[in-house]
Amino acid sequence: MENKNEAEIFEIIAHGGNAKSLAYEALNSATEGNFEEAKKFLDESEQEMAEAHKTQTRLIQDEINGEKIDTSLLMIHAQDHLMTALSEKSLIEKMIELYKKLEEK
């Protein structure tokens, strides 16, 4: 059985994965003291996160409006990708703040 929301699910997975990868690129830049580049990567990560969230919100609104949204293992995987990306990005932002403080000393 094919999931009719498969394209949207893969959008969430792709954008969530991109967001997480970009956040780690930001962390790598910060560890080298390149905070301008780190900010650029975090901004790009935020854009990817926004795209994933937009797709997620659209699916939620469709379900609220009575459309049947299949809860598949693939959908759960997409939500997991997005949640971990959000969580890790938040932690990475705090780590970058710490690197900045260490650099100032």
Could you say what each language-model-derived stretch is?
Residues 1-105:
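Terminal alpha-helical segments
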